[in-house]
């Protein structure tokens, strides 16, 4: 099994991976400083489908802890796992690399965060839901833990939103993504919002936005460790997460009008390009009400600094 080493958005000639493993499915596992959770995440992949059926590519991006060595040690004992080391710590960039330079041709593509534990048979359930929904481009999993699990489940089942923690994309959809050259802007926070939109648009932002293109899967479940209010480390994580949620909100608000007007080819390469293109709109952005307001102000300050629109 090959361990690939990637620098930001490029792969050297000697780093290119095999076109396809014998497995039918590929799963991208995004890992950024996940040394404590990544083994449990991979073990849960093992229990959620036959390891003869799925190949896991662990996208180790921008890690400053022991994640890389932990994954490499695990992969030495498990041929169905390939570590991919990426210098840039960015999920959107890692998503692009997986789709275009890592995974070959598979029957289905799964995406999971490196801190989630996938419930037994969840990948099978997602695949069956996807195959049983001919009009769907994606199948969305639901959480079975966390204080907000009921609310998040409602988002999936009623609003047909994709949660970035775990989802599946149809083979034909990935093929069309590649043919169109569609990439997520580097720096985009979270893949769930933009992937949900691309799936519902069927890669045509100027066309119809159809909920039925996302198939909710109530039997495809995952869980994750809840943050503790008594842990200083978890409080820091909570702070960063809330700022990132605010960034994600405004990034989506800025991106959608560009795509609706210019189509998929208008997709910016990075959030820096997005901010520059929407510099005039950024000046008019305002914080929301409630607790979000505090974190929105931090996010807006960062966005305006990147756009040079202080």
Predicted regions and their residues:
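Cell-envelope/extracellular polymer assembly enzymes that use nucleotide-activated donors
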Residues: 24-26, 55
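Short, well-formed alpha-helical segments that are part of the catalytic scaffolds
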Residues: 34-48
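Acidic helix N-cap motif at the loop->helix transition within catalytic regions
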Residues: 37-40, 65-74
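A conserved acidic beta->alpha catalytic loop
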Residues: 44, 57-69, 88, 116
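Active-site nucleotide-sugar/metal-binding loop of Leloir-type enzymes
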Residues: 96-108
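Short beta-strand-to-loop acidic/aromatic patch adjacent to the donor-nucleotide binding site
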Residues: 105-117
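Conserved donor NDP-sugar-binding/catalytic core segment of glycosyltransferases
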Residues: 117-153
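Terminal low-complexity segments of carbohydrate-biosynthetic enzymes
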Residues: 229-310
């Amino acid at each position: 099994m090959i361990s690939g080493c990637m620098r930001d958005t490029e792969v050297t000639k000697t780093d290119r991976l095999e076109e396809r493993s014998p497995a039918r499915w590929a799963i991208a596992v995004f890992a950024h400083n996940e040394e404590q959770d990544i083994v449990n995440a991979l073990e849960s992949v093992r229990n959620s489908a036959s390891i003869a059926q799925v190949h896991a590519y662990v996208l180790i991006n921008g890690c400053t802890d022991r994640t890389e060595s932990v994954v490499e040690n695990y992969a030495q004992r498990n041929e169905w796992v390939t570590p991919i080391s990426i210098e840039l710590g960015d999920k959107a960039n890692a998503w692009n690399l997986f789709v275009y330079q890592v995974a070959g041709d598979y029957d289905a593509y799964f995406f999971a965060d490196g801190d989630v534990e996938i419930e037994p048979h969840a990948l099978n359930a997602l695949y069956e839901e996807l195959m049983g929904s001919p009009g769907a481009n994606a199948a969305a999993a639901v959480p079975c833990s966390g204080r907000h699990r009921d609310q998040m489940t409602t988002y999936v089942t009623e609003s047909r939103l994709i949660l970035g923690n775990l989802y599946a994309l149809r083979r034909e959809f990935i093929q069309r993504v590649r043919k169109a050259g569609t990439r997520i802007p580097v720096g985009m926070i979270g893949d769930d919002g933009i992937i949900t939109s691309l799936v519902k648009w069927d890669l045509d932002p100027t066309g119809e936005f159809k909920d039925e293109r996302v198939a909710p899967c109530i039997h495809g479940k995952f869980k994750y460790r809840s943050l503790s209010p008594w842990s200083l480390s978890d409080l820091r994580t909570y702070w960063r997460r809330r700022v990132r949620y605010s960034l994600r909100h405004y990034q989506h608000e800025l991106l959608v009008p560009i795509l609706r007007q210019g189509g998929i080819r208008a997709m910016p390469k990075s959030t820096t390009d997005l901010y520059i293109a929407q510099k005039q709109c950024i000046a008019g952005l305002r914080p929301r009400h409630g607790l979000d307001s505090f974190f929105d102000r931090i996010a807006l300050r960062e966005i305006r600094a990147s756009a040079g629109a202080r």
